[in-house]
A protein has these predicted regions:
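Core beta-strand elements of the Rossmann-like FAD/NAD(P) dinucleotide-binding domain
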Residues: 2, 240-249
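Conserved flavin/dinucleotide-binding core of flavoenzymes
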Residues: 15, 23, 234, 299-428
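Active-site/ligand-binding neighborhood in enzyme catalytic cores
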Residues: 124-223, 234, 253, 263, ...
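Flavin (primarily FAD) binding-site architecture
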Residues: 252-269
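Glycine-rich FAD pyrophosphate-binding loop
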Residues: 21-45
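Dinucleotide-binding Rossmann-like beta1-alpha1 core, especially the glycine-rich loop
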Residues: 48-118
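Central beta-strand plus flanking loop segment that forms part of the substrate or channel wall
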Residues: 270-298
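N-terminal Rossmann-like FAD-binding beta1-loop-alpha1 element of flavoenzymes
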Residues: 2-29
Length: 428
């Protein structure tokens, strides 16, 4: 019998395993995939290092920055775009990034009005829950509908919000974006910067390896968990092939949208079951396109497009470039259909030829069932505290239920730090 079993090998699970092992507990980590990393996944494509999932970090993210400092890992800051495109209805307009940001800022300032009072301490969403509830009850679309905006302001702001939400705006809660804004120093510019400019040299894999090397623990890949049985003394974890592992405590670091695939005995309390049934809203796509055209760093946004944000990530010496796009629904974009990708490219950033495209379908992936956490309306008022509560010897963890940077690597590390320490304490 192990002291602690950790279920899930993303950043939350690996951090929790390390923290329990540092406290001299024997730890077994079970991961359903044949790799660690969860919703981060470093790779290489056409000679470029790419991230199929989470990628960006920032010094405003304290847990991530502490781990980067500990590991001695440098970061890389991408160049800002030289040219920006945006759409008002079907009309494409272009100008400088500053010009488009000024349009976005006029709408953004109205969208976030009041958030400083609702989220005075962004790492503690319960600090002013009464004030936060007014926003928590709204979808992003409902919040947008409250605002007096010109057509241009509305379309630019809608496209910005779609790229952040990675979900249809009538399904995504306003607080997920408002929290991101608050954590970024209540600034549009920093909200954009924290989510898209700073990456880890060597990729997210380098940081994950550094954390996992921080203390010895066993790990078993390709071991999806189907059932968890727990009582006052122990936890039994059964994998899909029928193998049963036992421990004195367990950390379940599984994405919210995948938790429903695990059978708990005794059943989880009704408040947790309601939260799991609600899930989180993200269902988008992150697509990488190898394109040929004008060798300039630029991006374009268009509301309602299959990838409503598309921008240059890297230029190649042969005149080609790597573009990255984000869309609100993975089912609207098939990276394997280059003809469709070309048609969609022409409709947001014309003048480029799509040579190849790739993406991972996180929505279809049974181990994630979605991308970064974008909570639905009512999450913080009704579900957040319940999902952070222990159930006997079972501790839940993950970026989806973090207090701070939920949906980011930082939120996963935050949650893993807390869960690993808690599980070690439960062992005694």
């Amino acid at each position: 019998m192990h002291d602690v079993i950790v279920i899930g090998g993303g950043f939350a699970g690996v951090t929790a395993a390390r923290e329990a092992a540092l406290r001299r507990r024997s730890v077994l980590l079970l991961e359903g995939r044949e790799r660690l990393g969860g919703r981060t996944w470093s790779g290489e494509w056409h000679g470029w290092p790419i991230e199929y999932g989470g990628a960006w970090v920032h010094w405003h993210q304290p847990h991530t920055w502490s781990e980067l400092t500990r590991a001695g890992l440098p970061v890389e800051i991408s160049d800002n775009a030289q040219l920006a495109g945006w759409y008002v209805g079907s009309e494409r307009r272009s100008g400088s990034i500053d010009e488009r940001d000024e349009i976005a800022r006029r709408g953004w300032d109205r969208f976030v009005d009041g958030v400083a009072q609702a989220l005075p301490a962004p790492h503690d969403p319960a600090a002013a829950l009464g004030a936060l509830a007014r926003f928590d009850r709204l979808s992003i679309a409902e919040r947008l509908g409250e605002l007096p905006l010109s057509d241009e302001e509305r379309d630019v702001l809608t496209a910005e919000l779609e790229s952040l939400a990675h979900a249809p705006l009538d399904d995504a809660g306003a607080v997920s974006v408002l929290r991101w804004h608050a954590l970024s120093g209540y600034s549009l510019e920093l909200t954009q910067f924290t989510g898209g400019r700073v990456t880890i040299a060597g990729g997210t894999r380098a940081l994950l390896c550094a954390i996992s090397a921080g203390a010895p623990f066993e790990r078993l890949l390709g071991a999806p968990v189907s059932a968890i049985r727990h009582n006052a003394d122990r936890v039994e974890v059964e994998t899909r092939d029928g193998t049963v592992f036992a421990a004195r405590a367990a950390v379940v670091a599984v994405p919210l949208n995948a938790l429903g695939a695990i059978e708990f005995t005794p059943a989880l309390p009704e408040d947790k079951q309601r939260a799991i049934a609600l899930g989180q809203a993200s269902r988008g796509i992150k697509i990488m396109i190898h394109a040929r055209g004008e060798p300039i760093i630029q991006n374009s946004i268009r509301p309602g497009h299959p990838f409503g944000y598309l921008g240059t990530e890297a230029l190649n010496g042969d005149g080609s470039q790597l573009m990255i796009g984000f869309g609100i629904d993975a089912q609207l974009c098939d990276a394997g259909d280059l003809t469709a990708v070309q048609r969609q490219l022409d409709a947001i950033l014309p003048g480029y030829e799509a040579l190849d495209a790739t993406a991972h379908d996180w929505l279809a992936d049974e181990h994630s069932r979605g991308t970064w956490a974008i909570h639905r309306p009512g999450w913080y008022e009704h579900h957040h505290a319940a999902m952070q509560r222990d159930e006997g010897r079972v501790v839940l963890a993950g970026s989806d239920i973090a207090n701070g940077w939920s949906g980011f690597i930082d939120g996963a590390i935050e949650s893993g730090l807390r869960a690993g320490a808690r599980a070690a304490a439960l062992v005694g």
